Design a protein with these regions (language model features):
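Catalytic glycan-binding domains that act on GlcNAc-containing polysaccharides
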Residues: 1-150
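Extended ligand-binding clefts on enzyme/binding-domain cores
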Residues: 146-163
Length: 173
């Protein structure tokens, strides 16, 4: 739903795609959750970790975990670490039956049918052509606002929500 303010986020360059791929593949071997599903979640949640900031619900880190959930599945890791967060996502999905019912596990991760479809669609695209991750990786970050889609470039930083009009006046698009 479009909002009249831009979020209290920081947009940083994501980790190198090679590092992310290594983390996805390592976790696939450990948890049985396909690398492309882990990558799709990372893309949807934080554009591969470039979006830094808590969600409106309080979720944190590259894979957007609630701190209590991360504590249960993160094996003592750092919620803000891409590798630790990806590992926790694999652990969470595996514990929620990904091997037998991926859609159920994905729904437990984010209880929205549209989310499950989006993860599956992006995962299928990356599984069919692993080079697709490079294309997704290079996407810009846009935020849906009442003024339309607003580009949030690398370097965007807001400590608190910013009225869209104020931001666009200072950063015409």
């Amino acid at each position: 739903e479009p909002r009249g303010t831009l979020p209290a986020w920081r947009i940083n360059p994501p980790p190198p795609v090679e590092e992310l791929l290594a983390a996805y593949r390592d976790d696939e071997a450990a948890s049985g959750v396909g690398w492309s599903h882990l990558a799709a979640i990372n893309l949807i949640e934080t554009h591969f970790g470039s979006v830094n900031g808590a969600s409106s619900a309080g979720a944190q880190g590259p894979m957007q975990f609630m701190p209590s959930t991360f504590a249960a599945y993160g094996m003592g890791g750092d919620i803000r670490s891409p590798r630790d967060s990806i590992m926790a996502a694999g652990n969470y999905l595996a514990a929620n039956g990904f091997a037998n019912n991926p859609d159920h596990a994905l729904f437990r991760y984010n209880n929205a049918d549209a989310y499950v479809r989006a993860v599956n669609d992006y995962a299928a695209a990356m599984a069919a052509d692993p080079a697709a991750i490079g294309a997704f990786y290079r996407w810009d970050v846009y935020y849906v606002s009442t003024a339309g889609d607003v580009l949030l470039p690398i370097g965007y930083a807001a400590e608190s929500p910013i009225p869209v009009g104020d931001y666009l006046a200072a950063h015409p698009q």
